[in-house]
Curated annotation (Swiss-Prot):
One MF term in the entry's GO annotations: magnesium ion binding
Organism: Streptomyces coelicolor (strain ATCC BAA-471 / A3(2) / M145)
Name of protein: 1-deoxy-D-xylulose-5-phosphate synthase 1
Protein residues bound to Mg(2+): 144, 174
Recorded family membership: Belongs to the transketolase family. DXPS subfamily.
Gene name of the record: dxs1
Keyword Metal-binding: yes
Length: 656
């Protein structure tokens, strides 16, 4: 057995020799490369924290000592060392999550995986332990760009205010955020400043000098200032120490002994300490190190030797379609600019940045600032396009509401990874945007159903200069084009029937689901009209008279069914005094487990069979048994779905 295979928990690390620790690190990297290549996942960040994670678990007693991970995608090594070595179904249904998970292990504390939050968590946990008289340690690991987030600095400000509250902050500086500091004097002074003896001597000297009449305070301030200036010339800790944090480093994050030594010194303090570790993203895997874009931050299923993607080739992604079209628009309009929050490549803005380097800004992990800056750009006569993941726009709701919408700024928000994202798990599903944003006055929301509509609606959005607009689209490849057969007002009609009883409102990428459901229903003699509203907020006025000609309206959306498009449609029909029942199909009010997107949609009942079955059951409840022409009466179980042989079975969770 390998050394790694013999590790059942953190305590097994403590008896290993220096040579064995080096061998273990090599085994972990080899394991990660091959395991993540089979499933896809975050490879580069985890290759960079191998020694750091080993040192953390050798110095601290997890789970009694709480080790908290910011941006939890760098927790794979932590999982391996805490008894979770079955990576065969990583990020797959029934397998390990790609992020920390409380359901998996007592060693996992934070699982939301949104960056820059760990220091706030650590501040609260440290306060709780101090109030309760506990002596265990709280260790917050932050890095991979997370210190660009404003929340991290808000937390640092509060952490530093309590000089007597122990808390250890480990900065994983993987050369993507900080410039490394060099020089033995800097290391020596950092070590000196973090010894108990030095702190006692400093406190004694300060007390003596400040009690000396007339000159004492002046002498102390002069000496203290000279010391700070001398040290800051060699090391970057001035900012942290000015906040009141003890600074230790920089430390070679790939030297287990050096990291352990720094962490043990940090444990001896009675206040907040920051340990600065220099690491290399993608360490030990040459293809990752050669990847200038992001050092293999995330990879799909691939050959670990050639790095060639494996599996069936998909079509163009939604992201790439957006990226190509925004460049075309930029060629035509010099006023169109772009903003993203540390996601230039993932959201498709890299081609725009290459073509127009002076018209794009990456603001770091700062969605709030992105929205407010966009308001300023719009007020200055430009049209900003803010491209972020849908789940991260939640952070900028107040700014979108009060800075963009209130001021009627012409800003276009483009939400990538909207709806069910699947394998990235609960915190990365973009399933709340169309619910949360329903309350924003003046905001227009578009949900394109295919690539052509994405291109068209993006152009429609940037043409609006007196209100905010928003487009949303999912992860993965774009499906085939879904042509319209007619247009009623602003509605695209995708399907009609001679005797239509059901109006299916297909929100964006749910169009194929609705068309499939219509086909199943019509096989049972239930005629359907399928429309795509294109712009789902505000509700198109043409929908009310169309709905009035049907027995039932069903709204199908890849969004929370609570307060989503279905609710908005029901409200609009009520205001228009159209007395037709509205059934809402969407994502239930729960956090979704990681699985493939298709698996999640099936689990929550967003498939053609599920939608058709529950619509048939609803119609059966609305009339006496045997009244329907064209077939036998449908059973009336209260609610249900259509099985393959036409029977009604109990529903899944995605409808009410």
């Amino acid at each position: 057995m390998t050394i790694l295979e013999n590790i059942r928990g953190p305590r097994d690390l403590k008896a290993l020799s220096e040579a064995e620790l080096g061998e273990l690190s090599d085994e972990i990297r080899d394991f990660l490369v091959h395991a993540v290549a089979r499933t896809g996942g975050h490879l580069g960040p985890n290759l960079g924290v191998v020694e750091l994670t080993v040192a953390l678990h050798r110095v601290f007693e997890s789970p009694d000592d709480r080790i908290l991970w910011d941006t939890g995608h760098q927790s794979y090594v932590h999982k391996l060392l805490t008894g979770r070595q079955d990576f065969s179904k990583l990020r797959s249904k029934g397998g390990l999550s790609g992020y920390p998970s409380r359901e998996e292990s007592a060693h996992d504390v934070i699982e939301n995986s949104h960056a820059s939050t760990v220091l706030g968590w650590a501040d609260g946990l440290a306060k709780a332990r101090q109030v309760q008289g506990e002596r265990s340690h709280v260790v917050a690991v932050i890095g991979d760009g997370a210190l660009t987030g404003g929340m991290a600095w808000e937390a640092l400000n509060n952490i530093a205010a309590a000089r007597d509250r122990p808390l250890i902050i480990v900065v994983n500086d993987n050369e993507r955020s900080y410039a490394p500091t060099i020089g033995g004097l800097a290391n020596h002074l950092a070590t000196l400043r973090t010894t108990d003896g030095y702190e006692r001597a400093l406190a004694w000297g300060k007390d003596v000098l400040q009690r000396t009449p007339v000159v004492g305070h002046t002498v102390y301030e002069a000496l203290h200032g000279a010391k700070k200036g001398f040290k800051d010339a060699f090391a970057p800790q001035g900012l942290f120490e000015d906040l009141g944090l003890k600074y230790l480093g920089p430390i070679d994050g790939h030297d287990i002994g050096a990291v352990e030594s720094a962490l043990r010194r940090a444990k001896r303090f009675h206040g907040p300490v920051l340990v600065h570790c220099l690491t290399e993203k993608g360490r030990g895997y040459e293809p990752a190190l050669r990847d200038e874009e992001d050092h293999f931050h995330t990879v799909g299923v691939m050959d670990p030797l050639t790095c060639e993607p494996l599996g069936p080739a998909g079509g163009p992604s939604w992201t790439s379609v957006f990226g190509e079209e925004i460049v075309r628009i930029g060629e035509e309009r010099a006023d169109v600019v772009a903003i993203t929050a540390a996601m230039l490549h993932p959201v498709g803005l890299a081609p725009f940045a290459e073509r127009f380097p002076d018209r794009v800004w990456d603001v770091g992990i700062a969605e709030q600032h992105a929205a407010v800056s966009a308001a300023g750009l719009a007020t200055g006569g430009l049209h900003p396009v803010v491209a972020v993941y849908a789940t991260f726009l939640n952070r900028a709701f107040d700014q979108l509401l009060m800075d963009v919408a209130l001021h009627r700024c012409g800003v276009t928000f483009v939400l990538d990874r909207a709806g069910v994202t699947g394998v990235d798990g609960a915190s990365h599903n973009g399933m709340w945007d169309m619910s949360v944003l329903q309350v924003v006055p003046g905001l227009r929301i578009a949900a394109p159903r295919d690539a052509d509509q994405l291109r068209t609606q993006l152009r429609e959005a940037v043409a609006v200069d007196d209100a905010p607009t928003l487009l949303r689209f999912p992860k993965e490849s774009v499906g085939p084009a879904v042509p319209a057969v007619d247009r009623i007002g602003g509605l695209d009609v995708l399907h009609t029937a001679d005797r239509s009883e059901v109006l299916l409102v297909a929100v964006g990428v749910m169009a194929p689901v609705c068309l499939g459901a219509a086909e199943l229903l019509e096989a049972r003699g239930i005629g359907c009209t399928v429309v795509d509203p294109r712009w789902v907020k505000p509700v198109d006025p043409a929908l009310a008279p169309l709905a009035a000609r049907h027995r039932l309206v069903a709204v199908v959306e890849d969004n929370s069914r609570a307060a989503g498009v279905g609710s908005a449609v029901a409200l609009a029909l009520g205001d228009a005094e159209v007395d037709v029942p509205v059934r809402r199909f969407g994502i239930p009010e729960q956090f979704l487990a990681h699985a493939k997107r298709a698996e999640v949609l099936a689990d929550i009942g967003l498939t053609p069979v599920d939608v058709a079955g529950r619509i048939a059951a609803s119609l059966a409840l609305a009339e006496p048994a045997g009244d329907r022409a064209g077939g036998p009466a449908v059973e009336q179980p209260g609610d249900g779905r259509m099985s393959g042989d036409g029977r009604i079975v109990m529903p899944a969770q995605g409808e009410n």
